[in-house]
């Protein structure tokens, strides 16, 4: 076959396969579509291995739950040569009707997917923290869910605005400064203490706000907090 598609539990499983099949290995005319998703080091090592045996590598990730593969909810991120991406689009479309070509930067899929995971995990963990606060205060989780769903469009708009602000470097213009958000977080921490909930998440947030303010960015937009992650 011209294409070899791999989607395994981890790169260790992949390495076990190739380590046992390297006698007279020749990948000339073949493209490996690697959807296992590894670390930056694993991706670069695999690329060197594929080149050694005269093959082409498409590095990618499947961004969805297993039950969503092949549905409109799925998304595949790919990196590699444009010719390889175009040649394998029929195969990729079976796994996901939507795919995005990230160009020749082979580490782009793994970094981009992890970057998205950072935002998604932070939001979901914060939401779970909020749910526990509601439970401790005898507030219905149906009410909590309703307000989360009702305000979701605002979070989406704010996410877009913050990413654009980071991209342009304009982190001064704001309706709500780091200081204002910080006061809100201090109040959240105080409520968490009063309700005797676990403080790990809120203390971590509090530390981030303090670092941002110490960096002289208290009057800047919340997007300025990106500076402390650099």
Language-model segments: residues:
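NAD(P)+-binding Rossmann beta1-loop-alpha1 motif at the extreme N-terminus of oxidoreductases
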Residues: 1-3, 30, 66, 98-100, ...
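Rossmann-fold NAD(P) dinucleotide-binding segment
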Residues: 1-58
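Residue-level detector of anion-binding/catalytic polar loops
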Residues: 3-4, 56, 98, 140, ...
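Short alpha-helical
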Residues: 12-13, 41, 83, 183, ...
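Proline-centered loop/turn at the N-terminus of a beta-strand
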Residues: 31, 56, 75, 198-200
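Rossmann-fold dinucleotide-binding core
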Residues: 37-118
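Helical "substrate-binding/catalytic lid" subdomain
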Residues: 108-204, 208-229
């Amino acid at each position: 076959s011209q294409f070899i598609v791999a989607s395994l539990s981890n790169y260790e499983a992949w390495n076990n396969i190739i380590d046992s099949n390297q006698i007279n290995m020749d990948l000339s005319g073949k493209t490996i579509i690697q959807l296992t998703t590894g670390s930056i080091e694993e991706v670069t090592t695999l690329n060197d291995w594929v080149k050694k045996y005269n093959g082409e590598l498409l590095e990618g990730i499947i961004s969805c739950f297993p039950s969503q593969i092949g549905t409109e909810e799925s998304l595949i991120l790919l990196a590699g040569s444009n010719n390889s991406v175009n040649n394998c689009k029929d195969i990729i479309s079976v796994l996901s009707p939507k795919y995005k070509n990230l160009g020749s930067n082979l580490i782009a899929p793994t970094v981009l997917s992890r970057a998205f995971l950072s935002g998604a995990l932070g939001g979901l963990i914060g939401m779970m923290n909020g749910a526990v606060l509601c439970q401790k205060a005898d507030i219905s989780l149906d009410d909590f869910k309703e307000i989360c769903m009702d305000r979701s469009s605002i979070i989406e708009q704010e996410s877009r605005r913050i990413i654009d602000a980071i991209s342009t470097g304009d982190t001064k213009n704001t309706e709500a400064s780091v200081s204002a958000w910080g006061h809100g977080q201090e109040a959240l921490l105080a409520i968490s203490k009063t309700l005797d909930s676990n403080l790990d998440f809120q203390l971590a947030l509090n530390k981030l706000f303090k670092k941002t303010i110490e960096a002289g960015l208290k009057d800047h937009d919340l997007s300025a907090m990106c500076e402390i992650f650099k």
